[in-house]
Amino acid sequence: MKQIDLKILDGRIGNEFPLPAYATEGSAGLDLRALTESALTVAPGQTVLIPTGISIYIADPNLAAVILPRSGLGHKNGIVLGNLVGLIDSDYQGPLMVSLWNRSDKPFTVEVGDRIAQLVFVPVVQARFNIVNDFAQTERGEGGFGHSGKQ
């Protein structure tokens, strides 16, 4: 298991609320919690930025982290990430914040400590461009959206 530096920014972590942890041996994501001062109601159509109480420093340029929605929040309550996916670069050291967007038609209350998103570490390949006039021919070629069919 890869070791990542984590800084606790809110003293409630480790006391009232646990550090982010994998729920099972097969879990890909670690749950991030809402570390607000009090409950927060998100109105329909509103987007809010919520602190998680932690910062991380990945340090390895071959890794990044992504903040992803929790499936139940989106499916059951219409709560998704305001930026759809949050990308955490390996050299970022600031606080992890979660942008929540209420796309439903009902207010949604986020309680202090609620699990609101998940953090997943992913491999990164930094590429260098090779300028060419033409590409090698493929069966697909320039076929774009819908090119491969529906079934």
Curated annotation (Swiss-Prot):
Known function: This enzyme is involved in nucleotide metabolism: it produces dUMP, the immediate precursor of thymidine nucleotides and it decreases the intracellular concentration of dUTP so that uracil cannot be incorporated into DNA.
Designated name of the protein: Deoxyuridine 5'-triphosphate nucleotidohydrolase
Pathway: Pyrimidine metabolism; dUMP biosynthesis; dUMP from dCTP (dUTP route): step 2/2
Gene that encodes it: dut
Catalyzed reactions per annotation: dUTP + H2O = dUMP + diphosphate + H(+)
Similarity comment: family membership: Belongs to the dUTPase family.
Keywords associated with the record: Hydrolase, Magnesium, Metal-binding, Nucleotide metabolism
Molecular-function GO terms, alphabetical: dUTP diphosphatase activity; magnesium ion binding
UniProt EC number: 3.6.1.23
Enzyme class name: hydrolase
Domain of life: Bacteria
Keyword Mitochondrion: no
HAMAP family: dUTPase_bact
Species annotation: Actinobacillus pleuropneumoniae serotype 5b (strain L20)
One Pfam family here: dUTPase
Highest classification ranks of the organism: Bacteria, Pseudomonadati, Pseudomonadota, Gammaproteobacteria, Pasteurellales
Residues reported in the UniProt entry to bind substrate: R70, S71, G72, N83, L87, I88, D89, M97
Keyword flag Hydrolase: yes
Entry's Gene Ontology BP terms: dUMP biosynthetic process; dUTP catabolic process
Cofactor(s) the record lists: Mg(2+)
Xref: InterPro entries: dUTPase (IPR008181), dUTPase-like (IPR029054), dUTPase-like_sf (IPR036157), dUTPase_trimeric (IPR033704)
